[in-house]
């Protein structure tokens, strides 16, 4: 008996069971989540705290915000009139006999931030804050609310 036909049939059958593609030794990678900084999803209050600020305040009509850095003579940054005007005090001084800061901008404008620990509502969102804030910039006064961030 000739075994060649049997070997030929076995080889054909075996080749039918294999794929044209060689098996991949690489695993299919898991989907990659978009890389976004944690602060992109955080609230403005959490972002300010993460930047090391000690106070953040906001107000309406016109819209404004103020942020105060850490230290004995912290930087004070404010965005006024819905962000149309920005001011910076490089080294604000603590108020004597009150909670707050005062200083002068680089172009000579007097700035005073007075803070009072009392419940405050911004009037627009009905969000309650633990601090009322009054920001004086030159002869203009802005009223609003805020919170100390590092307590």
Residue ranges and their predicted role:
Residues 25-49:
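Post-signal peptide N-terminal segment of mature Sec-exported envelope proteins
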Residues 17-21:
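Bacterial signal peptide processing site
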Residues 142-150:
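Short, low-complexity, Pro/Ser/Thr/Gly-rich segments in the mature regions of secreted, periplasmic
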Residues 47, 51-114, 147:
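Central antiparallel beta-sheet cores of small beta-barrel/beta-sandwich binding domains
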Residues 108-128:
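Acidic, glycine-rich flexible loop segments
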Residues 121-126, 132-142:
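Short, exposed beta-strand-loop hairpins at the edges of beta-sheets
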Residues 1-15:
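Sec-dependent bacterial lipoprotein signal peptides
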